[in-house]
Amino acid sequence: MSKQGELLFSYDEVDQVKLSKVTVYNWGSFNGLHTLNIDPEGTLITGENGSGKSTIIDALMTLLRPASRVSYNLAAAQEKKNDRNLVSYIRGSFGSMVDDEGNQTSRNLREQAVVTVIKALYEYTASKQQVALLGIFYINSDSTAYSDVKKIYSVCPVDVDVKELLFRFKNFDVRPLKEYLKAIEGC
């Protein structure tokens, strides 16, 4: 029997699950493929305003929360400045402009049909087993509403290569992508 305050086991003996990487493709201001490696001992996300800190956290929230319950850019939301949503992240919206008719509209990095991928890779500390959470989102060039966003979510018991996902999803044909994910045991 253990004394009060004494642990029954050390944390080194427990197989914990820790976030090890966040990968985004065409998410917010991150155009193309970007990966953030997370140190299992801890990672500090810091930087100037507009450097992408909230953008990375919001990518994680997109995978971890039900779509109807995601609140983006909570730091700005406290100041009533929250103007981010799933479509604005997919489009890479930044600022606004006035169009030829005098209407204010968003400025976007990606106006065309676009695919966005978010991957959170988790790793067990002792066994080194991996789990990948995936979110794949795509919209047509004329889409501006949340209801227009097509979504595919997957949980895989192995790391999944985002470049391979994109290759399977060329021409916005979802069938080869779904076949690829089904072929991965446990996805």
Q: Which positions does each model-derived feature cover?
A:
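Extreme N-terminal "head/tail" segments of very large remodeling/mechanoenzyme assemblies
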Residues: 1-183
